[in-house]
Structures are given as C-alpha cells and as structure tokens.
Amino acid sequence: MNRKSWFKKIDHIGIAVPSLADAIPMYEELLGIPVEHTEEVADQRVNTAFFSVGESHFELLEPTAEDSPIAKYLAKRRGGMHHMCVEVEDIDAVLAEYKRKGVRLIDEEARAGAHGKRVAFIHPAATGGVLLELSETPDSSED
C-alpha cells in the first residue's frame, strides 16, 4: 500500500472519570505536570481537562449529564480509557472514504470538539473494539 496515511499523529488518549476535581490532582501527581487546559464541550455533555505529554495529550472526561456517553460508560466501567484520538488533515475526506467503504461510523459528519477542533467517532465494531476519534485542527495546514 503506497498511499500516504490520513493520520498525522496520536492527538490524545481520552480517560473517563467521575470527577475532574478528584482526578486532576491525582494525574498532576502521577504525571508530574500541571493540567494545561480545562473546557466544557456542551455538545458532548462533558467537562474536559488536558495534560500535555510530548506531542500528545491525556484528556480527562467528566460527564455533565446523566444521559451523556461518558456517564453511560462510567455506569458500566467506573472509569478508565475511553478512546484514542488521531489527528487528520481533512476529516471530511476521511469520513467520505470510510462511508464509501462501509465503515461503521458513530458520526457521519464532523462536529465541534474541544479546542475548536472538528471531530468524529468511528464505531468500535469497525476497529476491533477501540473507540477511535478523528480530529481536525483548525488551520492544520499551518502545522
């Protein structure tokens, strides 16, 4: 296969937590670095906290509604790794190609994510059990 990969890098690992107030100090101690950024992502009904680790990040996800995907995840698993996110150049092109190939998607169109990024999720049934998030950074052509 000679085509160039759509993936630029692993952007972050998403970790579901019941409480950012409890998790942030624990991760600051474990990682030896302060939290870099916190943000509410209303569309996904979560509060997030990011820690930079090289070119990638740990993203802590706290639900803000009982019916949010993170709340449902926590009800089954009490916490832990939720998803892996990869940065792509052109999320619309990647989604179009996956749809053409019949890849099972959670999001058929990109939506708003943290940091002003456009995101979409691929269903775990299409990835061997891993929830994979695609992320396009605004003005990513300037990287």
Predicted regions, residues:
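Conserved active-site tyrosine of GNAT-family acetyltransferases
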Residues: 23-28, 51, 98
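An N-terminus-focused feature that recognizes amino-terminal "leader" regions
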Residues: 26-30, 42-45
